[in-house]
């Protein structure tokens, strides 16, 4: 779904919302992205249909808002249009742009910490589900991501676990970022100008946490030890157009 405000009064907006669901039996789409999985993740070669589950890249909700806004200050604009030339050179003619993105997380894939049992399988062996995995919403969720980690159990000897390839009842943390910029063109003469920009990636320095350890039996099971988006980055840009 898309909503757009075409450029008027210095403002242009574009908002998109995606609601989707992806199901497959092998999620690899890029050999360079290992977490997508592949035929190598087939747990039981005699029952390949058990691999059918949510795609490991399934993200149900994605909202994105982008905008471009000419600040209404300076010559030819709504406010302070009669300011002296030197003041307009500093205060007038600025433009800001931004992209805001919010999305749900991906379903989690659970494995066994030691690789599982000596059985003829192609890929990682999975645990048993004795309940529904849920996320811990307490203050300690980064160190204890799962509300009840005991709903994931190691299978009995010489058996394979019944957990699906991707579990949708618990997902990786949601995603929120805002990339913003502000800039101005300084006109030198006709068809010649100098452009200055300040850009901020993850402008609000909002932490986007990565996926918790999902290997049942690990000492760090349920712990998140990295972020998937870096801290705020500021960048200055200069461009001479002619």
Mark where each language-model region is.
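Short, solvent-exposed micro-motifs at the edges of structured domains
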Residues: 1-242
